[in-house]
């Protein structure tokens, strides 16, 4: 007999939840059952971001660097940056070069004497912020045009010393504050468009993930910051959605959801030990497969060779 000739098996959210409820010793019956299972699935996806590197969530990004600007937004939903380089002469075979840039801690960045020094960036500090926008905390005290690089607000008391603000639909980066005036403003950040804004427009803080480079990019050549990030897994969504998870992780996902669901249904507690064991085993199998397969070689540093 012939095989099906297809390899497209997948489950939508409704089928995933139904399977999980059956493993937990119950049945999917009500709309609330679906809602609570979807919530548990989203919580589990958040937990997966803490368990290791999920290779299917890798994405490459490129930022064109501006001379004199040292801080740049990274897309909201970024879990972490995995690799990063400074690229010069981009998109031309004879000139493109990717140069090393080292990630440093906040402690190391804080000890740099002159953070405004300009040259080719060789170090970067990544701030893993949550991407949330606060409620309005102040307002503009005067109208600004699309090209203004100084912005006056009614009160800067609640603003961080440097960072991003949202005015109407525009994200603006400011370098420092003096009094109630924001200076060294970079307009139209985070894929927004620089625009004019009227006096009394609301100002909110944006906690955007960001990289700060040192030295600050100079104008000797055109630089790009090229990075590979691990993004968040997409939310579970509605009942007809398929999950943002490769087929190899489907057994793990269903086993995990069954374990989460069993904690919330009558009679589910007695199944928890076996469901937890099944989830842990399924996770380990999937995680062991979800890894780099490239060869690796360890070479001792020259300073240690020959030392007794």
Predicted regions, residues:
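Glycine-enriched, solvent-exposed interface loops adjoining structured elements
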Residues: 1-135, 204-308
């Amino acid at each position: 007999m012939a095989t099906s000739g297809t390899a497209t098996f997948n489950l939508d959210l409704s089928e995933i939840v139904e399977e999980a409820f059956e493993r937990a010793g119950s049945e999917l019956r009500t709309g609330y059952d679906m809602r609570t299972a979807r919530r548990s699935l989203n919580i589990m996806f958040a937990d997966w971001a803490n368990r290791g590197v999920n290779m299917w969530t890798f994405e490459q990004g490129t930022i064109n660097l501006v001379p004199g600007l040292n801080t740049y937004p990274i897309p909201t939903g970024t879990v972490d940056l995995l690799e990063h380089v400074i690229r010069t002469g981009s998109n031309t075979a004879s000139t493109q070069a990717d140069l090393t840039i080292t990630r440093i801690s906040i402690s190391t960045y804080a000890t740099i004497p002159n953070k405004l020094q300009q040259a080719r960036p060789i170090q970067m500090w990544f701030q893993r912020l949550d991407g949330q926008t606060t409620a309005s905390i102040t307002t503009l005290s005067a109208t600004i045009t699309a090209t203004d690089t100084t912005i006056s607000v009614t009160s800067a008391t609640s603003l961080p010393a440097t960072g991003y603000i949202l005015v109407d639909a525009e994200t603006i980066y400011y370098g420092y504050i003096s009094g109630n005036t924001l200076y060294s403003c970079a307009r139209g950040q985070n894929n927004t468009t620089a625009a004019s804004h009227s006096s009394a427009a609301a100002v909110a803080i944006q906690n955007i993930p960001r990289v700060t480079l040192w030295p600050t990019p100079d104008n000797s050549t055109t630089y790009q910051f090229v990075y590979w990030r691990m993004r968040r897994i997409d939310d579970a969504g509605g009942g007809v959605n398929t999950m943002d998870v490769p087929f190899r992780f489907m057994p793990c996902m269903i086993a995990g959801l069954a374990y989460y669901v069993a904690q919330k249904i009558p009679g589910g507690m007695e199944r928890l030990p076996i469901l937890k064991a099944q989830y842990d085993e399924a996770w380990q199998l999937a995680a062991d497969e979800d890894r780099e397969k490239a060869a690796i070689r360890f070479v001792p540093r020259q300073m240690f060779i020959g030392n007794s």
